Amino acid sequence: PMELFYNWDDKDLTNALEELGIATLYSKTGKLVSTTPYIEEVLKCDLFVDFSGEMWGYHADLVGKNRFLVGLIKDRVAQLLKKPTVMLAGSQGRFPDPNIKKFAKEVFENFSLVANREAETGKLLIEDGFDVSNLKNFACPAFLFKPASDDEIAPILKKENIDVNKNNKVGFILCGFNMTEAPY
């Protein structure tokens, strides 16, 4: 659920920092000293996918206070919980706050793969001092997205022999310039 990732309230940063502390201890000891609903969801995942697009950078704060920092922390929590993490359809940057930029580099470099949707961003990341060895450029998949009802999805799952009760689960963070209110 989106509210476990970012809920547009004053607790978002506090909750994320608590989760970062829990995940950091886990990465050093292998023991989970506490948990949260977000951590429980991450632990269920076989693969953690960040689908932030332009929201992976300063644009994120246009939709909510500390939105980018909270997103970075949530990504890092998944990494520290030893989940393979992938950024899909990214368009990262810019990073005007030097402290957040330093943390963004750490998170970026710990993605298993960054599947970028255009090459220009890679050049900007290199200018910003990012290690882009995990970056691959692809075409933007946005044109493939269209809404579908459960009735439309069921035959696809059957045809592809996908049993939602037996197959591995993948968690997505879906986010973008699709908000219902300005400034979008």
Enumerate the predicted regions with their spans:
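Active-site anion-handling motifs in enzyme catalytic cores
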Residues: 1-184
